[in-house]
Each structure stands twice: as structure tokens, then as C-alpha cells.
Amino acid sequence: MKLLVVGSGGREHAIAKKLLASKGVDQVFVAPGNDGMTLDGLDLVNIVVSEHSRLIAFAKENEISWAFIGPDDALAAGIVDDFNSAGLRAFGPTKAAAELEWSKDFAKEIMVKYNVPTAAYGTFSDFEKAKAYIEEQGAPIVVKADGLALGKGVVVAETVEQAVEAAQEMLLDNKFGDSGARVVIEEFLDGEEFSLFAFANGDKFYIMPTAQDHKRAFDGDKGPNTGGMGAYAPVPHLPQSVVDTAVEMIVRPVLEGMVAEGRPYLGVLYVGLILTADGPKVIEFNSRFGDPETQIILPRLTSDFAQNIDDIMMGIEPYITWQKDGVTLGVVVASEGYPFDYEKGVPLPEKTDGDIITYYAGVKFSENSELLLSNGGRVYMLVTTEDSVKAGQDKIYTQLAQQDTTGLFYRNDIGSKAIRE
């Protein structure tokens, strides 16, 4: 069986590597992928994610069994619909189902309609009305661009002035273009955040281990929001009762609701949750695997990944098993200056040996193909599975201390919340 993974980051590296390790999978292509993936025997295809017709032609010419779609923008652009129309299978939601991610207002409407716990909110396209709402509600308050904004479209404002400025940047200054033409303004929720993922097909779903991401750039959750600087799974201090509540009050009603709306959901559903004094509430939905959470969840899968996905797509009950003990922890290494301006072309350390996994993201080979160089904001991620969060930290940070990370940076406290609890 030959498979195609669409995307180019660390998430797609983890997906493709796990698929290639599955029985019956002979070859995994990644479009466009990154040069670091070739070190794990993956084949790159020089087609960008927005070129649906070229991807479809490639899949047909190479007798691809099915495609796994990684990035949110491809799903929002209807790549799954296009593959299906061409008679090809793709694992991911249709454009209509993916609206759970590409419109925060739509997600809110679904949650309200199906009684899913989330923050109180208002949606605005008129700046003066947004400003009046902010002034009426007070701070802290959260301002979100309605559409996709590379994970940067959320401002947690500690003052009314900050919130008004964020709304102005989105609605009047076109900071995020069409994605910010509407804003969702939410009450601030206090509590610890965690991620819950599920494989889904219609109202059938299969929960994955819990994970905790670290969005801020710097230690102590300081600095600007990023795509994510590290993660670990499962979250050891999170009671199973909280997970069970989230499944029954959030995951199940949302997926059943999407079926009722005529938008049945196939793919990975990510639920960003916050554990408040009133129980778990939804911060956001993503219509695909998270990055970096994928890189610490998939190493815990002990069943056959390709078979699991194939079964889910076919409506067959999958046999999914997860490692029960230990913790998987990963730290992202990023270009200095990320998430703002950064240099490219920094030489990278050689791939680690042993049981530390390296997943590559923003990298490319030098002209003579002897060296990997940085080529993006988030560059690579080191992942290990150990008995505890502390053991995972020790292993990764010892390895990083031995690497030359000049021109790069990473957080030194990934997983520390689990140790403090």
C-alpha cells in the first residue's frame, strides 16, 4: 500500500513516520514535506498543499490508497471534497465539517445549540459595536479573529485598552485580512489548559491520550503566543473523571450535532479545553492534529496506525491500543526571533541516535546536501518516552545541552506544570 501525507511540518513528519512503520505500507509520500523527513525513508513530492489538482493527479498516477491531510488551511480550502470528487479517499473533514476550526463563530453557534460548555461571547464585524461590548464587559477579556490566523489570531487582553486595540487591528487595520473581518470576543476563563484528540467518523469516535501544549515562546509562559514550543502526554495530574466529563459533555454532543447539521465529521478532532471551577470548557476546536501534540501522541500508539485509519474511514471498528505507562515529552527548537522575524540557514546538529526521536519542520539541506539548515520558525523537535515527566525532561535537556543551538532557542520548562502539581 502506498500513502500520501499532505503538509510539511513536524506534525506531518510524525504522521508519515508512523504510517511507514505500519504493516502493509510500502511507501509514504509527503507533499511537499521537508528535507529532514528523508532521513526516515519518506519520499518528498514537490507539490504545495494548495495545488489540489496536482496532488490528485499525483495520487492517481502513483496508485495512492488514501491521503492523510495535515494542515488546517488545506482542509478549509476543501481538499478532502476535491479528493472525494475525484474518486480518491482522504482522511480529514470536508470543508463544511472543518468550519468548526475555520470559523470560531460557527463553532460557538454549534456549542450553544448543542449545550456544550464554553465561554460567553459576542461576534462583531463592526468596530464600534465591538468596542462598546468590550467596554461593557471589562477586562480581562479575549479577542479572537474569526478565521484562520496561523495560531496568532487570539489576544488575551488584560486591559480594556488592549482589547480595543486588538479589535481595531483586526477589524479596521486588516491585520489578518479576511480572517479578521469578524471577531469573536469572549469572557476570560481561568484554569489549566489541556488538549483532547479523537479519531472520528460521524458519531463514532476514539479518544487519544490527553496532552498539554506550551503556547508561549518563553519559560514561565511568558512572551508571545506561538504555534507551540513543546508538549507532553498524557497529562498525569488530570483526573480521568475530567476526561470522561469532557467526552460526554463536549466530544459526543459536538460530533452528533455535526451529523444532525448534515456535516458529518471524518478525521481528527482536536478540542482545546480549560479546566475551570465549573468543570472543563471549550476554548477552541481544530479540525486536524495539533502541532506539536501529534509528535508526542503518535509515539504512544501501539496498534497499526495505517490499519486504524483505514478501518475508521471504512466504518469498521478499529483495534486501537496505546502505551499505558510512562510519559512522552517533546521540546521544540525554534529560530531565534520566532514567532516574529528570524534568520534562516543556521546549520543544525546531527540527528540524535538512540531512543530520542527527532521530528523536523522548518529545515532544508545545504546545496551540497551534507548539512541540514534551518528554514522556518519552528525547526525541529526532540521527543522521548520515559517513566515520568521529570525523567523525560532530564533526557531531552541533557541532549539539547550537548547540541550546538547557536541561532536557535527552546524553552527549558516543558512539562514543569505536571511536576508542580
Curated annotation (Swiss-Prot):
It is an enzyme of class 6 (ligase). Its EC number is 6.3.4.13. Disulfide bonds: none annotated. The keyword Manganese applies. GO terms for molecular function: ATP binding; metal ion binding; phosphoribosylamine-glycine ligase activity. Keywords: ATP-binding, Ligase, Magnesium, Manganese, Metal-binding, Nucleotide-binding, Purine biosynthesis. Pathway: Purine metabolism; IMP biosynthesis via de novo pathway; N(1)-(5-phospho-D-ribosyl)glycinamide from 5-phospho-alpha-D-ribose 1-diphosphate: step 2/2. Binds 1 Mg(2+) or Mn(2+) ion per subunit. The keyword Zinc does not apply. It comes from the Bacteria. ATP binds at residues 134-195. GO terms for biological process: 'de novo' IMP biosynthetic process; purine nucleobase biosynthetic process. PROSITE patterns: ATP_GRASP, GARS. It catalyses: 5-phospho-beta-D-ribosylamine + glycine + ATP = N(1)-(5-phospho-beta-D-ribosyl)glycinamide + ADP + phosphate + H(+). Mg(2+) binds at residues 284, 286. Residues 108-314 form the ATP-grasp domain. Its cofactor is Mg(2+); Mn(2+). Pfam families: GARS_A, GARS_C, GARS_N. InterPro entries: ATP-grasp, ATP_grasp_subdomain_1, PreATP-grasp_dom_sf, PRibGlycinamid_synth_ATP-grasp, PRibGlycinamide_synth, PRibGlycinamide_synth_C-dom, PRibGlycinamide_synth_C_sf, PRibGlycinamide_synth_CS. Belongs to the GARS family. This is Phosphoribosylamine--glycine ligase. It comes from Streptococcus pyogenes serotype M1. The lineage of its organism: Bacteria, Bacillati, Bacillota, Bacilli, Lactobacillales.
